[in-house]
Regions:
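C-terminal transmembrane helix end/exit motif
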Residues: 1, 68, 135-142, 146-147, ...
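N-terminal membrane topogenesis motif
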Residues: 1-31, 69, 76-87, 116, ...
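Signature of the first transmembrane helix
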Residues: 8-67, 92-104, 121, 126, ...
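Helix-loop interface residues and adjacent transmembrane-helix termini in multi-pass membrane transporters
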Residues: 40-43, 79, 110-113, 143, ...
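Helix-loop junctions and terminal segments of transmembrane helices
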Residues: 62-79, 138-142
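Transmembrane alpha-helix boundary signature
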Residues: 69-70, 97-110, 131-143
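Substrate-agnostic recognition of the 12-TM MFS/MFS-like secondary transporter fold
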Residues: 83, 88, 92, 134-157
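Short hydrophobic/alpha-helical segments at membrane-entry points of transmembrane helices
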Residues: 118-120, 176-177
Length: 197
């Protein structure tokens, strides 16, 4: 086995371990968040947020651009390619947000849950916030630098969990969960641009 093959195998193994750890750490942090917020909020609050998340998830699946995958697989990656994908992702997220915003009223009527309307209006813009993040994490995946990617994802999750718990103590309703999701998107912007301007 050549030195390059051995180095690649080592990086793949480290990446697999880092991604496995990431999955477990984020799950543990998520369980901590749920365990605490469940004592402060009602099942109804979780239902409102869950409904809005399902709606957002469906729209995101329909509008997925796959730009990140393109950057990872491209052989000769230039800065212009990165800038183009970043711009396209942002431009695609804006009509998605506006569509969801305008459909929030009819969707809340269809779902027989009037509180969902205002929640959808806010979570609709989460993809826009996430699109403003630096493409650094995608470039880390391309370079197979999964250890650094692990720290980034854990930092964002940790900030989101702390924000959600604090908001649950203060607000005592479903808006704590909604704003917790927004805080995760904002944390992603701050953390990625702090390390990859």
């Amino acid at each position: 086995m050549s030195a390059n093959s051995s180095s690649l195998a080592t990086r793949v193994m480290r990446g697999a371990v880092a991604m496995l750890l990431l999955r477990w750490v984020t799950r543990v942090l998520g369980l901590v968040s749920v365990a605490i917020t469940a004592r402060l909020l009602t099942p109804d609050d979780f239902g409102v947020m869950g409904t809005a998340s399902i709606v957002l998830g469906l729209f995101l699946n329909l509008s997925s651009s796959g730009g990140g995958e393109v950057l990872v697989r491209m052989k000769n990656l230039e800065p212009d390619h990165v800038h183009t994908v970043w711009t396209m992702r942002l431009l695609m997220s804006i009509p998605l947000a506006l569509t969801l915003f305008l459909l929030s009223g009819p969707l809340s009527v269809w779902l027989h849950e009037p509180r969902v309307a205002d929640v959808i209006k806010l979570v609709a813009f989460i993809p826009c916030f996430e699109a403003l993040a630096s493409p650094g994490p995608t470039l880390l995946a391309r370079e197979m630098n999964f250890t650094r990617l692990f720290y980034l994802r854990v930092a964002v999750k940790f900030i989101s969990v702390i924000a959600t718990i604090v908001l649950a103590f203060v607000l005592r309703d479903y808006w704590a969960l909604v704003l917790g999701q927004v805080s995760a998107a904002l944390a992603l912007i701050v953390v990625t641009h702090a390390f990859w301007p």
